[in-house]
Regions:
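A conserved structural/catalytic subdomain of Rossmann-like adenosyl-cofactor enzymes
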Residues: 5, 10-255
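Short, conserved SAM-binding/catalytic segment
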Residues: 1
């Protein structure tokens, strides 16, 4: 494959030709960074965001071939961002592309490398059948991937596995709205008119907020002593092993 070591954001997006475009784009662009004015100048004036992830979204839209497909990971901030630049980018996405699916991912999915909550946007460079005039998107499905049973969060030792995506695969081929107790929407389909009416707020089918449990002081202290005892035991085991390896014996009582 042809691989170029370069900054993809330093070329004027309006100068790309069909030969520069792709049939498929799969990307997890960098997010959290800020770009300088000389980089932003390569983008249309209404989409000159300082955020790297926003500019990559614009770049992808300009480099996806007609009938091409894209799957892009974006941070939560892109979904709920309400500044004029983000609204312009998301409006272009709905007008010029068929944004058919958004998957909400668990917040710790990329732990320990980042705790930023992320999502996958699936869209095609096509016009959906029945889309209203002026738009290529007719409707967008949202699906929330909850943490698998037995997991509070992902980590380096308990990372996400392929089978944890099975609920997405099952739902993908048999799409239906899923509403849990108390109106908690796990999956729902929104029309493009619905999305435009909210100024392109894509922060839908959100993860429910967890209520913080506040224990009584006696329980907090008991839990602390229990954990400290377990930690002291592990430290004693480690120190004993070190003494065995070094062939020494330190009498702690004499210290």
């Amino acid at each position: 494959p042809l691989v170029y070591h370069d900054n993809s954001l330093t070329k004027d997006v309006l100068n790309y030709t069909d030969g520069d475009k792709f049939d498929v784009v799969l990307m997890n662009p960098p997010y959290g960074g800020n770009e300088k004015s000389d980089v932003k100048s390569h983008f249309p004036s209404d989409m000159r965001s300082s955020e790297t992830a926003d500019l990559f979204m614009v770049l992808i839209m300009y480099r996806l071939k007609r009938n091409g497909r894209a799957a892009v990971i974006v941070p939560d901030g892109f979904l709920f961002g309400a500044d004029n630049t983000k609204i312009a980018i998301k409006t272009k996405l709905l007008r010029d592309f068929n944004l058919h699916t958004i998957i909400r991912l668990p917040g710790s999915i990329f732990a320990p490398y980042t705790s930023i909550a992320t999502n996958i946007l699936f869209f095609d460079n096509t016009c959906a059948e029945g889309a209203p005039e002026g738009y290529s998107t007719k409707e967008t499905w949202f699906y929330r991937l909850d943490m698998p049973e037995g997991y509070k969060h992902f980590s380096k030792t308990k990372s996400m596995k392929s089978e944890h995506c099975d609920p997405i695969r099952e739902w993908w081929n048999d799409r239906k709205e899923i509403i849990i107790a108390d109106g908690d929407e796990k999956s729902r389909c929104y029309s493009v008119e619905d999305l435009i009416a909210t100024d392109c707020n894509f922060d839908l089918c959100k993860f429910p907020k967890e209520d913080e449990e506040i224990l009584p002081p006696a329980e907090l202290l008991a839990d602390y002593f229990k954990k400290r005892k377990a930690l002291d035991h592990e430290i004693d085991k480690t120190l004993a092993e070190i003494q065995r390896i070094l062939g020494i014996n330190v009498n702690v009582d004499e210290l």
